[in-house]
C-alpha cells in the first residue's frame, strides 16, 4: 500500500510542478508591448500569418481626454480578447484585424465608449462631437500569440 501512495504522491507533485511552469510561461514570457496614439490606425497582426483567433491581450488601457481636459481611462483587455476570439469559428480566419473594421478609423476619443462620458447619450449631436476633435487618445497594452 505504501508504494501506491508514494506513486500517487509523486504523480501529484509532478502535475503541480507542470501547472506552475505553464502558469509562469503564459504570464511572464512572450508578451510584447504595443502603443497607439491618436490618429494611428490600430491593426493587430500575427507575425507568422497564423489565425488572429490565437492572439491574446493583457493590461490594455484606452486613455483619452474630453473637451474639458479631464483624463479618462478604461480597461479594454476583455474587448480586444473577445474581438480576437470571435474569429475562432471563421472558415478562413484572417491573420490581422483592424480596430474599426473595414472603416479603418484612426484612434480617437470615440474608439472605445465609456458610458456617461463619450457615449451617444452624452455626445448626442454633431456639434458636440466636433468639440472632441482635438482630444488626445492612446491605446497601450501587451499582446502575444498562444
Swiss-Prot record:
Compartment(s) where it occurs, according to its Swiss-Prot or TrEMBL record: Host membrane; Virion
Membrane-spanning segments: 7-27
Regulation: induction: Expressed in the late phase of the viral replicative cycle.
GO cellular component: host cell membrane; membrane; virion component
Keyword S-adenosyl-L-methionine: no
Disulfide bond entries: none
Keyword list, A-Z: Host membrane, Membrane, Transmembrane, Transmembrane helix, Virion
Domain of life: Viruses
Membrane topology designation: Single-pass membrane protein
Family listed: Belongs to the asfivirus E146L family.
Name of the protein in question: Uncharacterized protein E146L
Origin species: African swine fever virus (isolate Tick/Malawi/Lil 20-1/1983)
Amino acid at each position: 500500500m505504501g508504494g501506491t501512495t508514494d506513486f500517487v504522491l509523486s504523480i501529484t507533485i509532478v502535475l503541480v510542478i507542470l501547472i506552475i511552469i505553464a502558469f509562469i510561461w503564459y504570464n511572464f514570457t512572450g508578451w510584447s508591448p504595443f502603443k497607439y496614439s491618436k490618429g494611428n490606425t490600430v491593426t493587430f497582426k500575427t507575425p507568422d500569418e497564423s489565425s488572429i483567433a490565437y492572439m491574446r491581450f493583457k493590461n490594455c488601457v484606452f486613455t483619452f481626454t474630453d473637451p474639458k481636459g479631464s483624463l479618462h481611462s478604461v480597461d479594454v483587455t476583455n474587448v480586444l480578447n473577445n474581438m480576437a476570439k470571435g474569429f475562432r469559428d471563421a472558415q478562413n480566419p484572417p491573420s490581422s484585424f483592424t480596430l474599426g473594421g473595414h472603416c479603418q478609423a484612426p484612434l480617437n476619443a470615440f474608439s472605445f465608449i465609456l458610458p456617461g462620458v463619450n457615449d451617444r447619450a452624452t455626445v448626442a449631436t454633431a456639434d458636440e462631437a466636433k468639440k472632441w476633435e482635438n482630444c488626445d487618445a492612446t491605446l497601450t497594452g501587451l499582446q502575444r500569440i498562444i
